[in-house]
Design a protein with these regions (language model features):
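Short helix-capping/turn signature of helix-turn-helix
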Residues: 53, 102-109
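Amphipathic alpha-helical packing segments from all-alpha helical-bundle domains
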Residues: 83, 91-94, 110-145, 166-173
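Helix-turn-helix
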Residues: 16, 20-58, 62
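Amphipathic C-terminal alpha-helical segment
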Residues: 129, 147-165, 174-182
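Solvent-exposed, amphipathic alpha-helical segments
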Residues: 20-28, 70-77, 102, 146-157
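N-terminal intrinsically disordered/low-complexity leader segments
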Residues: 1-12, 181-182
C-alpha cells in the first residue's frame, strides 16, 4: 500500500508530481503520462495525484507549463532578430509533438484550451518583442503573425534541421528585410 506523505510540504508534493509528469512527457510524450504510473513512481496513492490535479489534463498543463518555463529561462536576450526567431523556432520544434497534443486535447478539454490560448499569446508576445527592433509599430502585429505562420508551416514539414533553419532564415529575411540580420 502506498505510504502517506503528511510530512512533505504541499509545494514539495506538487513539485514532485509536476517534475515526474514533465519527465514522462519529455521522454515518452502524452502516451507516457499515466497518473497511475506517476503515483507508483512517487510511492503515493493515485488519489493523491488527483488531490492536486483534478484531471489528467490539469497535470498535462502543469507539466507543459514547467517545460515552457525551462525553455524561457534560456532564451537569448540579445542578438539579431532573425537569430532570436531561429532560436524560438528550434525550441518549438523540440516540443512539436507536445504542441500537437495540446492542440488536440484543447478540442475536448477547456482547461487545455485555455492554456493553449495563453501559450499562443505568450509566444506571440515573445515574437513581437524579438521583432520590435526591425518592424515598424504599424506593422509589428502583422510581422509577428507572418513569422509565426512561417515557423509553424516549416515545423510541420519533415525536413532536416539544416534545411529547416535555411528556410526559416530565408523567409524571415524576406518578411523583415535586411535589418533583421543586424
Amino acid at each position: 500500500m502506498p505510504r502517506t506523505r503528511a510530512d512533505v510540504a504541499r509545494t514539495d508534493k506538487l513539485d514532485e508530481i509536476v517534475e515526474a509528469a514533465r519527465g514522462r512527457l519529455v521522454d515518452g510524450g502524452y502516451g507516457a503520462l499515466s497518473v497511475a504510473d506517476i503515483a507508483r513512481q512517487l510511492g503515493v496513492a493515485q488519489n493523491a495525484i488527483y488531490w492536486y490535479f483534478p484531471t489528467k489534463d490539469h497535470l498535462l498543463v502543469a507539466a507543459v507549463e514547467r517545460i515552457l518555463h525551462d525553455i524561457l529561462d534560456c532564451k537569448p536576450k540579445r542578438g539579431a532578430a532573425v537569430d532570436r526567431v531561429l532560436w524560438f523556432a528550434e525550441r518549438l520544434h523540440e516540443f512539436q509533438d507536445l504542441r500537437l497534443t495540446i492542440r488536440e486535447r484543447a478540442r475536448s478539454s477547456e482547461v487545455v484550451a485555455a492554456f493553449e490560448r495563453n501559450v499562443v499569446g505568450l509566444l506571440r508576445l515573445l515574437l513581437v518583442n524579438s521583432l520590435s527592433e526591425v518592424a515598424t509599430p504599424d506593422h509589428i502585429d502583422d510581422a509577428a503573425d507572418a513569422v509565426m505562420a512561417l515557423c509553424e508551416g516549416v515545423l510541420l514539414r519533415d525536413i532536416s534541421a539544416v534545411h529547416r533553419r535555411r528556410l526559416l532564415r530565408f523567409g524571415i529575411e524576406r518578411l523583415l528585410g535586411p535589418d533583421s540580420t543586424v
